[in-house]
């Protein structure tokens, strides 16, 4: 491999081309009338989706320079997706427009540093203006509206998510699973719990696309101890491996030889295992492990106070659950054992009595947290369909809608369909600039703010975006939107065309910040196959042209 430094016009041209290709692929999914994208795979049927993040992540150009640029954009999209689980499409549309306009200004000889200052100054003003537009989400109907919009107008998805929120509360645990049946969408309330601890190694991941650990019918080992060596749990590991079921270990910590051995067993396929730290600290950790034991039917939480040793545990003494879902930050236990309901209720009553007896506000607060986790349960959205392609596409939309709903509950909502960004134009009219080039940066953001609504209208098959934008700005009503489903103007909140503030805010913030990175990017160093690499590849293939350096 050889290093090549790409600079100047060649770099600018490549950035424009890659951004345009990504925006074309992702932008077509925007809005309720957006189109789907088929993502080809090395095996099996292509995946059909409207998930902008999945689309952008799947684009891997062969050209090393284009790939480097695409990777920078994908990394930013990934951060946006991690923050709110939605907004990638809006982020891509905004980024593409800012970069397009900056390229024109650069070609005209403008000072790029001053342009960047203007763009960043405008960004802060827009973010402040967005905050002033928000409205809290209070009713079940409003929750359904947010979910429906994010699910591309699917009212069934919206109503089911609202039902889940009603079942488990606004702070409750809601998960999405694929169903074995043909029913499009169903809601199931079950016992369960979520706590803020993620997997101790990414090598435990079973779903690499979403970086999740997903187990069905696992055994659960609970201990207050720190596991440094593998010897104490070897008998358990051997018994679990023979059973063919997965194992989740919840301990004070798992490190050193114990962690490396578990990872090695997982990678070799001998044992489906994952480890997480126990929630809480001190006595609170002890209590929460006790709660998990009650929920999962575990007979023991191994500790120094307990006479029974870890190596003496049988499979019947371990906890179990229907499903386990672990991210890098959280662990969700879904579905308790069949005979645990009475024990769970008894534990709930015990915690309630402790709350009444406690004289400490701090202790009461922590007890209420435990009560909420144990009594709230888990709402499971089961997604079905007549084919695998249909199920996966619907599941993507359900997950996007769920992320959007959580964001809306957290920070409130703003007028949807790109209208909120459009209405921030007014604050930029009065924004003072130091010079003409800084003003040029502010004007670039002005044009970018119109890009999402233009794309949504274009995807509906209409060419009337300029007229729609002019009418919205003329009315001086920041709750007015254009509904592409009815092709009419309406009030955002009465018609339900609303977006979570958090999604709009973060998508805009990330888009402008990413564009700012490209503004002052003067060179990219990429690896390209050298002639020697090509010859070496060809030499081993007996006249078949080599393997292109692989």
Swiss-Prot record:
GO CC annotation, single: cytoplasm
Keywords, ordered alphabetically: ATP-binding, Chaperone, Cytoplasm, Isomerase, Nucleotide-binding
Gene3D superfamilies: GroEL, GroEL-like equatorial domain, TCP-1-like chaperonin intermediate domain
Domain of life assignment: Bacteria
E.C. numbers: 5.6.1.7
Recorded catalytic activity of this chain's protein: ATP + H2O + a folded polypeptide = ADP + phosphate + an unfolded polypeptide
Keyword Nucleotide-binding part of the UniProt annotation: yes
Positions annotated to bind ATP: 29-32, 50, 86-90, 417, 499
Biological processes, Gene Ontology terms: protein refolding
Pfam families for the chain: Cpn60_TCP1 (PF00118)
UniProt-listed PROSITE patterns: CHAPERONINS_CPN60 (PS00296)
Subcellular location: Cytoplasm
Recorded GO MF terms: ATP binding; ATP-dependent protein folding chaperone; isomerase activity; unfolded protein binding
Function summary: Together with its co-chaperonin GroES, plays an essential role in assisting protein folding. The GroEL-GroES system forms a nano-cage that allows encapsulation of the non-native substrate proteins and provides a physical environment optimized to promote and accelerate protein folding.
HAMAP family: CH60
Subunit structure: Forms a cylinder of 14 subunits composed of two heptameric rings stacked back-to-back. Interacts with the co-chaperonin GroES.
UniProt family annotation: Belongs to the chaperonin (HSP60) family.
NCBIfam families named in the record: GroEL (TIGR02348), PRK00013.1 (NF000592), PRK12849.1 (NF009487), PRK12850.1 (NF009488), PRK12851.1 (NF009489)
Name of protein: Chaperonin GroEL
Biological source species: Ehrlichia chaffeensis (strain ATCC CRL-10679 / Arkansas)
Taxon lineage: Bacteria, Pseudomonadati, Pseudomonadota, Alphaproteobacteria, Rickettsiales
Chain's gene name: groEL
